[in-house]
């Protein structure tokens, strides 16, 4: 009922100003300058987000920043409160969510240092809450069977790709990302299995975040950085965590440039129809709707 009223209210508006939520790695706020910066400790029905929400503007566009693993990177992937993170972005009024991820590669076509905008996911996690509608006290009512095709908002994906092209950064235009439970890395046997399944890249944080954003009715897309080859590739030694962090820090400025360019370009367009479609998708997939 609440979601239906939100959709009806939005339909009465001619245009909807966008607000971009950015979820990324630790210390995300340091390389991105925000005007009118404010920090908010947001409460949600699912507990606290990973950190405070940093609210502000990038070139006049309203944005929110959140460090997925905490600003000190002290939350392991399985313990991230994905529901609280996405819900907090919704509560802050975000119309879109752009995220950054680190990927390890299962294919020769994705080499360390490459940027990728994935187009699909395989969820191989087992310990993470997958839905807001779990029947628990304080959770929203109902059972929602949200469709996951397409996994990401295609229009938002294309803006990330266009921004990377505008800046001259070679970027993979698609890829299937398998999300591991972590925190360990996978074995050679697992790598071979994942490759047979059609996975191109591995992550520890993309799911259930992408699923929850869809369930929240928020257009969502990922900009990933390939940090290492997985152990299936005998031509390269296994990368250490310190080496992976080094590669990410070395390339983080390029990630931020792509995000800022994409945000600027997105703000120049009318997103009213896309925002409403994302909300209507959720409203039309409740099992107990009348």
UniProtKB/Swiss-Prot annotation:
Residues reported in the UniProt entry to bind phosphate: 68-69, 205
Pfam family, one: PNP_UDP_1
Catalysed reactions, semicolon-separated: a purine D-ribonucleoside + phosphate = a purine nucleobase + alpha-D-ribose 1-phosphate
InterPro entries: MTAP, Nucleoside_phosphorylase_d, Nucleoside_phosphorylase_sf
Gene Ontology CC entries for this record: cytosol; nucleus
Biological process (GO), any one: L-methionine salvage from methylthioadenosine
Compartments (UniProt record): Cytoplasm; Nucleus
UniProt cross-references to SUPFAM superfamilies, sorted A to Z: Purine and uridine phosphorylases
Enzyme class: transferase
UniProtKB keywords: Cytoplasm, Glycosyltransferase, Nucleus, Purine salvage, Transferase
Transmembrane segments: none
UniProt pathway: Purine metabolism; purine nucleoside salvage
Broad class of where this protein is predominantly found: cytoplasm
Site (Important for substrate specificity): 186, 241
Family in the record: Belongs to the PNP/MTAP phosphorylase family. MTAP subfamily.
PANTHER family: S-METHYL-5'-THIOADENOSINE PHOSPHORYLASE (PTHR42679:SF2)
Function: Purine nucleoside phosphorylase involved in purine salvage.
The protein's name in its UniProt record: Purine nucleoside phosphorylase
Organism: Drosophila melanogaster
Organism phylogeny: Eukaryota, Metazoa, Ecdysozoa, Arthropoda, Hexapoda
């Amino acid at each position: 009922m609440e979601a239906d009223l939100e959709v009806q209210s939005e339909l009465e508006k001619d245009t909807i100003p966008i607000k971009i939520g950015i979820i990324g790695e630790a210390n995300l706020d340091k390389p991105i300058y925000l005007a009118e910066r404010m920090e908010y400790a947001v409460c949600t029905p699912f507990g606290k987000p990973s950190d405070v929400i940093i609210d502000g503007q990038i070139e006049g566009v309203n944005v929110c920043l959140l460090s997925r693993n905490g600003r000190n990177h002290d939350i392991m992937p399985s313990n991230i409160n994905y529901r609280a993170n996405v819900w907090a972005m919704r509560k802050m009024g975000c119309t879109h969510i752009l995220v950054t991820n680190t990927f390890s590669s299962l294919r020769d076509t994705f080499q360390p240092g490459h940027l990728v905008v994935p187009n699909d996911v395989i969820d191989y996690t087992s310990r993470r809450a997958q839905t807001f509608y779990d029947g628990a006290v304080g959770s929203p009512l109902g059972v929602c069977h949200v469709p996951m095709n397409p996994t990401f908002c295609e229009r938002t994906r294309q803006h990330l790709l266009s921004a990377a092209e505008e800046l001259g950064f070679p970027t993979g235009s698609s890829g299937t990302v398998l999300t591991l439970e972590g925190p360990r890395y996978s074995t050679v046997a697992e790598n071979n299995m994942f490759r047979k399944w059609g996975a191109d890249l591995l992550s520890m944080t993309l799911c259930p975040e992408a699923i929850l954003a869809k369930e929240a009715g928020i257009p969502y897309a990922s900009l990933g950085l390939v940090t290492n080859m997985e152990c299936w590739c005998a031509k390269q030694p296994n990368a250490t965590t310190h080496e992976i962090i080094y590669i990410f820090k070395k390339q983080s400025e390029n990630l931020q440039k792509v995000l800022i360019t994409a945000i600027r370009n997105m703000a120049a367009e009318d997103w009213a129809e896309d925002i409403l479609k994302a909300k209507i998708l959720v409203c039309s997939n409740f099992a107990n709707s009348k």
